[in-house]
Design a protein with these regions (language model features):
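Short beta-strand/loop motif that positions the catalytic acidic residue
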Residues: 506-508, 512
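Amphipathic, low-complexity, repeat-rich surface-exposed segments
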Residues: 2-264, 268, 273-275, 286, ...
Length: 625
C-alpha cells in the first residue's frame, strides 16, 4: 500500500475463505477479511468532508458520477483546463502564430505546385509527403491516382500543421500539450479521407464491384454489433474460441481457491522437470489465458514441454461487492497466497516468479517487500511489459491528473467498480486508427467481417476493476509514482526495489502503447543491485508477448547488465545491442534453465497433506465469469 488514507465509503467488504480443499474436513477453515489488516489503517485517496455527515461530498460525487455517464468517464474540467492553458499561451505568442501562418502558406504553395505537376504528368508524380510508417491507410495503389493523391496528401499536410500548432507553445504544461495534441489527432482522424465514400477510392471500387451490397451487409453488421453490445454478449466470432475447449486447454488442476484467485498447477509434459517451479502472476485487467491461448501459441504449454512445473493465478472478475478491495489485498491474497501454495506443493525449492503487465508491477512490489523482510523464496523474477516507474508511462498519462482521477473515482464510487468496457474503450482511443476507424471501414462500409483470431477473442473477454484497487493503482502509481520514489508501504513500512537481489529477466515491446519499453527499461535504475537481462522484442503489448517460435516477422534484442556494469540509457542500449531474428521465448527458457537445477521427477498435483487438494480441472471457474 502507499500512503493514501483508508476509505470509509464502503462498510461491507467481501470476506475471504481459503479453499485448500472443498471437503467437509475443511468446513471449519477460519475466515479472513479480504481487506488486509495493513490496508485498514493505510490509505486510499484522501477526500474532503464538508460536514460531519459528509452530505455535501456525497451530493457532489453523485452529481459528477451522473455527468460521467454522458462524458464516457472523461472530465470536462480537465479538458477545459488543458485548452485554457494552451489557448492563453498561444494567444500571447505572436511569434508562434506567425510561424504557423508561414507554415500554412508554404504548405498551400507546395500543394498547389504538386497539383500542377499532377495535371501535367498524372500518376508519374511522386508524393511530396508520406504518412508515418505505422499509418497504412493510404498505401494502396488507388490512393496514388489523381485526385485522391491530392486529397490524402492534403490531409497529411493538415495533420502536420496541427501537430506544429499544438506543440512547441512556450509556457504550456507538458501534459496539457500532449493532451491537446492527442485530442487534435483524434478529431482529425474522424475526418480522414479514408472514412468517407466520396474520398476513398478503394471503398468506391469495392462498392462498384459489390453493387452497393457492401452497405447492406455493413448495416447488418452494425445492427448485430449493437444488439450484442446492448445485451452484454461478446462480439461476433468469439464463440469459436470457447475457454476450456479452444483456448486455455493446457491440462492442469485448480489446487487452491479464495475469493480473489484460483491457483492452477499444470500437468507435467515431460518425464523429468526442473525442481524450481514457475509461478505466473498475470494481469487482472484482462484474463490470464492470454498466456495459454491456442495450443500452438500457449506460453504455458511451451514451458511444460520444456520441463518446467508451471503454476498460474486466475483472478476473480469482481463485482460491486469488491469495491473496497485494494492493491495490498491483491498482493496478500493473490501473490503471497499463491506463493504459499506453490512452496507447499514443491517444498524446499525456490520459485521462478513471472509477472505480466500490472501483474508484473504487483510482483515487483511483493518481491521488494519479501527482500526487505528476508524472504528468499524467489530464485528469479521475470517481468513482461511491466512498469515500475510511471513517470513516462506513455499516452495513458493523458488520462491521469487530479481532475480526471477525481472524476473517475466518483464514477467508480457510484458503481463500486470500473466496467471492463470503459477500460477497453480507453485502450482503443490510444490506437484509434487500428481499433476504431479501420474496423469501421472494413466491417460497416465494406461489409467485410475480419476473421476472429484467438488473441482478438481474448481481448473481447473484459474484466472489471474494484473501485479502491483501481483508484490506488492510478493515483499512487501513475499520478504520484510512489513505487519509484520510495513511498510505497507494505505492512506500514516502505519498500524499495533496490533491495531485490534475485536475477531479473525484463521484456519490453517496441510498439507498446500501454507500457512503453523505455518506461519498462527504468527497472535498471530502480533495481540496480540485481543482475538484469533486458530483452526488447518486436510487436506490441499483447502480440509482442505472445510470440511463439515459428511466427514470422519476429525479432528481439537482449543484453545482460551485472550490478557492477555502467548504466546505459535506453536509446544507447538499443543502438549497441544486436538484433536477432525469431521468437524470444527460447532465449528466456535458456535463461531459466541456467538458473535451475538438474531435472527430477515431477511433483504431485496439489499437496493434500498441507490442505491443497485438487478442486477442479483447469481452467477453473473464475475465468468463466
Amino acid at each position: 500500500m502507499s500512503r493514501a488514507g483508508s476509505s470509509s465509503l464502503a462498510n461491507k467488504r467481501p470476506r475471504l475463505v481459503s479453499h485448500k480443499s472443498e471437503s467437509p474436513a475443511t468446513a471449519d477453515t477460519p475466515k479472513k477479511e479480504l481487506v488486509s489488516e495493513a490496508q485498514q489503517t493505510a490509505s486510499a485517496p484522501e477526500r474532503n468532508s464538508y460536514a460531519p455527515t459528509a452530505l455535501g461530498e456525497v451530493v457532489d460525487r453523485a452529481a459528477r458520477a451522473a455527468l460521467a455517464r454522458f462524458t464516457f468517464g472523461f472530465s470536462p474540467t480537465a479538458l477545459a483546463e488543458c485548452y485554457l492553458d494552451y489557448a492563453t499561451h498561444l494567444a500571447w505568442s505572436p511569434g508562434k502564430q506567425l510561424q504557423l501562418l508561414e507554415k500554412a502558406v508554404q504548405q498551400c504553395a507546395r500543394l498547389a505546385l504538386h497539383a500542377r505537376e499532377c495535371a501535367i504528368r498524372a500518376s508519374e508524380t511522386e508524393p511530396f509527403i508520406h504518412p508515418l510508417p505505422q499509418d497504412r491507410r493510404f498505401v494502396g495503389e488507388p490512393w496514388q491516382q489523381w485526385p485522391y493523391n491530392l486529397i490524402y496528401q492534403s490531409f497529411l499536410l493538415q495533420q502536420q500543421w496541427w501537430h506544429s500548432a499544438t506543440t512547441g507553445v512556450r509556457g504550456v504544461t507538458k501534459q496539457h500539450e500532449k493532451a491537446i495534441e492527442f485530442a487534435a489527432r483524434q478529431i482529425l482522424d474522424v475526418f480522414a479521407p479514408s472514412n468517407f465514400l466520396l474520398t476513398n477510392p478503394e471503398l468506391q471500387q469495392h462498392t462498384l464491384r459489390q453493387g452497393g451490397m457492401n452497405f447492406v451487409r455493413g448495416a447488418q453488421n452494425l445492427l448485430q454489433d449493437w444488439e450484442r453490445s446492448v445485451s452484454g454478449e461478446k462480439p461476433v466470432g468469439t464463440e469459436a474460441f470457447e475457454v476450456g475447449r479452444d483456448v486455455a486447454v493446457t491440462p492442469g488442476k485448480v489446487i487452491y481457491r479464495n475469493r480473489l484467485i484460483e491457483l492452477m498447477q499444470y500437468a507435467p509434459a515431460t518425464d523429468l522437470v526442473r525442481p524450481e517451479p514457475i509461478l505466473i502472476v498475470p494481469a487482472w485487467i484482462m484474463k490470464y489465458y492470454i498466456l495459454d491461448l491456442s495450443p500452438q501459441n500457449s506460453l504455458v504449454k511451451y514451458l511444460t514441454e520444456r520441463g518446467f512445473t508451471v503454476f498460474m493465478i486466475s483472478w476473480k472478475n469482481p463485482g460491486p461487492e469488491y469495491r473496497d478491495v485494494g492493491m495490498d489485498d491483491y498482493r496478500t491474497f493473490g501473490v503471497m497466497a499463491a506463493l504459499d501454495a506453490v512452496t507447499a506443493v514443491v517444498p524446499n525449492e525456490p520459485v521462478h516468479a513471472v509477472g505480466y503487465c500490472i501483474g508484473g508491477t504487483l510482483l515487483s512490489i511483493a518481491a521488494a517487500a519479501m527482500a526487505r523482510d528476508g524472504d528468499e523464496r524467489f530464485r528469479s523474477i521475470s517481468l513482461f511489459a511491466a512498469q515500475t516507474d510511471f513517470h513516462e508511462a506513455g499516452e495513458m498519462m493523458l488520462f491521469i491528473n487530479e481532475s480526471q482521477l477525481t472524476f473517475l473515482e466518483d464514477m467508480m464510487w457510484e458503481r463500486g467498480l470500473l466496467d471492463g468496457s470503459q477500460m477497453a474503450g480507453a485502450f482503443q482511443l490510444l490506437r484509434s486508427n487500428d481499433l476504431i476507424w479501420s474496423r469501421t471501414l472494413h466491417e460497416y462500409f465494406m461489409g467485410q467481417r475480419r476473421p476472429m483470431i484467438d488473441l482478438m477473442a481474448w481481448n473481447a473477454d473484459t474484466t472489471h476493476m474494484p473501485y479502491r484497487m483501481h483508484s490506488e493503482y492510478l493515483r499512487n502509481l501513475y499520478l504520484n509514482n510512489d513505487l519509484a520514489e520510495g513511498n510505497w508501504l507494505v505492512d506500514g513500512k516502505t519498500i524499495a526495489l533496490t533491495d531485490i537481489r534475485a536475477p531479473m529477466f525484463v521484456v519490453g515491446t517496441i510498439r507498446d502503447h500501454v507500457s512503453p519499453w523505455r518506461s519498462v527499461y527504468k527497472i535498471h535504475l530502480l533495481a540496480a543491485d540485481s543482475e538484469i537481462t533486458f530483452l526488447l522484442t518486436s510487436g506490441g503489448h499483447n502480440a509482442g508477448i505472445v510470440s511463439e517460435p515459428g511466427r514470422k516477422n519476429r525479432s528481439y534484442q537482449v543484453k545482460t547488465k551485472s550490478p557492477t556494469d555502467q548504466y546505459a540509457d535506453p536509446d544507447a542500449w538499443a543502438a549497441a545491442t544486436p538484433r536477432q531474428e525469431g521468437s524470444w521465448w527460447p532465449e528466456w527458457v535458456s535463461w531459466l534453465e541456467k538458473r535451475s537445477s538438474e531435472p527430477v521427477p515431477p511433483p504431485h498435483m496439489g499437496a493434500p497433506a498441507a490442505g491443497y487438494n485438487v478442486l477442479a480441472d483447469a481452467p477453473g471457474t473464475y475465468v468463466l465469469h
